[in-house]
């Protein structure tokens, strides 16, 4: 009986060790990807800040306050641009994004533009209204794709299909911290509103034509920066999850080894007892 128990424990130890080899390999891969994704995300942040500052300066002109991009659409619905991951095994990375979208959508009816395999699968499975399913892999989204998405969003917003457009993604804070956030993309709101500017921007062309040209570029830049942040966050979350899995596996192996040694000691004790008993009979 004890022998069978020992064999079961040995089999469980081997199983956990095999799983641990996989999670260690995944942690190494995630660490490698995280390093590159982190550099890309950090390099995009100055670009993001410049874009935000430029659009604020341009939009601070009173001539642009009545633009189609500054008014809420008449559709009464919100377009949620949701950036999630392409794979699982990343802790609560994807679940946290979906929870944030669900909280936002409680207040307003929403249409989803999913970016990433998990986002597309999640919302299709729940029969959500999908704006576009053209971006099933966030890892394959490039700058050109972000500009194309932005152009499509701007055209739909100007047509009055949506009251507002909200971007939901995960901001990379550190190797161990990633925060799901949301940002209103449209309608445009100037951060300078109510504040006097040191100078008013000089706009030589037609204001509406200017916005027609720069808003899609602006939104495309914001989307690209958010994609980079999300990729770094996914790799960071996966690395943390695999690291935790490795620690748990190590603890399980230690516990099983303790059980195995106790069972082995019990078998040896029993054998010694039987030998001693046999010797006494003789």
Please annotate each region the language model reported.
Residues 1-282:
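C-terminal beta-strand-loop-alpha-helix "lid" module of Rossmann-like NAD(P)-dependent dehydrogenases
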């Amino acid at each position: 009986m004890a022998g069978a128990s020992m064999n079961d424990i040995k089999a469980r130890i081997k199983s956990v060790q095999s799983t641990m080899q996989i999670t260690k390999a995944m942690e190494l891969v995630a660490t490698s990807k995280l390093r590159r994704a982190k550099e890309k995300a950090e390099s995009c942040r100055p670009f993001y800040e410049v874009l935000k500052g430029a659009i604020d300066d341009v939009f601070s002109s009173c001539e642009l306050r009545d633009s189609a991009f500054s008014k809420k659409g008449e559709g009464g619905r919100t377009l949620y641009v949701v950036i999630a991951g392409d794979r699982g095994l990343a802790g609560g990375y994807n679940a946290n994004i979906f929870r944030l979208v669900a909280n936002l959508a409680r207040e307003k009816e929403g249409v989803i533009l999913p970016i990433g395999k998990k986002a597309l699968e999640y919302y299709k499975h729940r029969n959500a209204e999908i704006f576009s399913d053209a971006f099933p892999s966030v890892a394959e989204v490039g700058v050109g794709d972000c500009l194309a998405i932005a152009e499509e969003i701007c055209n739909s917003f100007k047509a009055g299909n949506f009251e507002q457009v909200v971007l939901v993604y995960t901001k990379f804070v550190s190797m161990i911290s990633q925060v799901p956030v949301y940002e209103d993309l449209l309608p445009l709101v100037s951060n300078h509103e109510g504040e006097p500017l040191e100078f008013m921007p000089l706009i030589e062309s037609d204001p509406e034509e200017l916005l027609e040209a720069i808003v899609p570029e602006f939104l495309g830049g914001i989307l690209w920066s958010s994609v980079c942040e999300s990729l770094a966050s996914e790799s960071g979350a996966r690395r943390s999850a695999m690291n935790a899995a490795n620690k748990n596996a190590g603890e399980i192996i230690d516990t099983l080894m303790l059980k195995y040694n106790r069972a082995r000691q019990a078998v040896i004790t029993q054998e010694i007892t039987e030998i001693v008993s046999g010797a006494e009979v003789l």
